[in-house]
Amino acid sequence: MRQSIFFMPTLKETPADAVAKSHQVMLRGGYIRQVTAGVYSYLPLGYKVLRKTEKIIEEEMANAGVVEMIMPHMLPASMWEESGRLPKYGPEMFRLKDRHGREMLLGPTHEETFTDVVAKSLKSYKQMPLQLYQIQTKFRDENRPRFGLLRGREFVMLDGYSFAASQEQLDKQFDDEKAAYLKIFKRTGVEVRPVIADSGTMGGKNSIEFQAPAAVGEDTIATNASGTYAANLEMAVSVDTFKQEPEELKAMEKVATPGCDSIDKLAEFLQVPATRIVKSVLYIVDEKKKVLVLIRADKEVNEVKLTHLLDCDSLRVAETSDLEELTGAGKGGVGPVNADWADEIVADKTVKGLYNVVVGAGESDAQFINANLDRDFRADRFADLRVANEGEPDPVDHEPLKFTTSIEVGHIFKLGTYYTETMGAKFLDQNGKSQPVIMGSYGIGVTRLLSAVVEQHATENGVAWPKEIAPFGIHIIQMKMKDEIQSKLAEDLEAKFAKYDVLYDDRNERPGVKFNDADLVGAPIRITVGRDAADGIVEVKRPGDDQAQKLAVADLEDFIANELD
């Protein structure tokens, strides 16, 4: 490809609103252009990277026995009503009505459609296991699109779905998809860590995220040094090392605590450590159930874990007005003693083994001291409900947890019968008995993956693309376009190495302009044809090299084969 006819509108300055390195590089290099907030055009350079990435996905999916197809973008809202997911998505869902007033939506994901079209077509166990996927544009009405392709309102995604007649089949499909995804990420050159994750609105109980460490990441992952534990912070578990020595139980006593509207103020006022205070947090669950959560005051409630425990669609911390109406106390005075108004009291495991603690007295500006579990207040059940802290021991090898910001580039789920039972997708098993199809769901954010690659492979002046998804494998730069010897050599090299996808800079531009643009193209090999062309010598440079090296043209073939084959 001749650069003189290749559409690559580069920018000299970084746009002020581009914060993420990947966003800066893709705008400056002419990979993408914003059409409106969260919506981008993929210019030739960006589209080449996108298509090469999709090709890798297609190859690895075929190797794993996963078959490609395509579903529509526009979906009837009735399918999502049938599955029960429509109200869970809220304002992020793009919704519209056709001329007949029928509710439609633009698909952010396609579990319902695959269940309706595919799972309902599977009548016998003999038709399974089955695995399908599509690469398609998705839509999500993000409140705050940002970071370029990392959080957009329109994006390209691989979404796959598996259908099984048994849990054993699903387990194998899940493992096969995980292995295929790891191969995809390796070939695209992105470092990922599979981590324990929350399934969120997708449903199901078991899921793994693929997280790419990056400074601009919106997620936090918790890992140990030996690599035996990794989890999204939302699901991370740590070992609580605090242990209170047993004490003789004292008589519970109410004390006034004026102005103590924080744990720090309360601890200072009562001259006790936060580990001797039990916080009481009231949650309104599914807008009807009142659940009081107890946790040691030096810890914070993990609402994702709480959602899993309560198996609810929504929860929120009670407003001050709710607290006053239910308990007669303000925020700091709510407590578990005589809390008969609570539908359920659940406690974090940190509450076990505490003696003579401070709890809210059920009225404003007052606390009970020397309160004790079972004697003075109850907990209906215990669970790990706390946010893990960095440095705490992991639950596997008891090594200190390290927190890293990261980008979620993939997510796989064991959905089970979450959709098929609701939507009536059943088959006959070996005994002729009707059973719901067992499903899995698998996704890679393809355009987000491109941003993650740039975040990890950015250079001072551009990007060093991994060889399999680089827009061009070789970038030939001719110094003087009027030099016939240079032109002849550059054209010969372009033809000889055409299979590596060559970009030949034949523009009549200054060397500085050409080299700056070459940094943004980020080809694995840059060949400069200059003053030594008459002697059969060129300069070659890889993105990681400090300096270009001179190389005889006769040695180029072996050098390139060693780098790119």
Curated annotation (Swiss-Prot):
Catalytic activity line of the entry: tRNA(Pro) + L-proline + ATP = L-prolyl-tRNA(Pro) + AMP + diphosphate
EC number(s) per entry: 6.1.1.15
A Gene Ontology molecular function term of the record: transferase activity
Main location: cytoplasm
Signal peptide limits: none
Disulfide bonds: none
Keywords: Aminoacyl-tRNA synthetase, ATP-binding, Cytoplasm, Ligase, Nucleotide-binding, Protein biosynthesis
One Pfam family here: tRNA-synt_2b
GO cellular-component term (any): cytosol
Membrane spanning stretches: none
Biological processes, Gene Ontology terms: prolyl-tRNA aminoacylation
InterPro entries: aa-tRNA-synt_IIb, aa-tRNA-synth_II, aa-tRNA-synth_II/BPL/LPL, Anticodon-bd, Anticodon-bd_dom_sf, Pro-tRNA-ligase_IIa, Pro-tRNA-synth_IIa_bac-type, Pro-tRNA-Synthase_IIa_type1
Location(s), subcellular: Cytoplasm
Function comment: Catalyzes the attachment of proline to tRNA(Pro) in a two-step reaction: proline is first activated by ATP to form Pro-AMP and then transferred to the acceptor end of tRNA(Pro). As ProRS can inadvertently accommodate and process non-cognate amino acids such as alanine and cysteine, to avoid such errors it has two additional distinct editing activities against alanine. One activity is designated as 'pretransfer' editing and involves the tRNA(Pro)-independent hydrolysis of activated Ala-AMP.
Family, similarity comment: Belongs to the class-II aminoacyl-tRNA synthetase family. ProS type 1 subfamily.
Subunit structure: Homodimer.
Free-text note on domains in this protein's UniProt record: Consists of three domains: the N-terminal catalytic domain, the editing domain and the C-terminal anticodon-binding domain.
Name of protein: Proline--tRNA ligase
Species: Lactobacillus delbrueckii subsp. bulgaricus (strain ATCC 11842 / DSM 20081 / BCRC 10696 / JCM 1002 / NBRC 13953 / NCIMB 11778 / NCTC 12712 / WDCM 00102 / Lb 14)
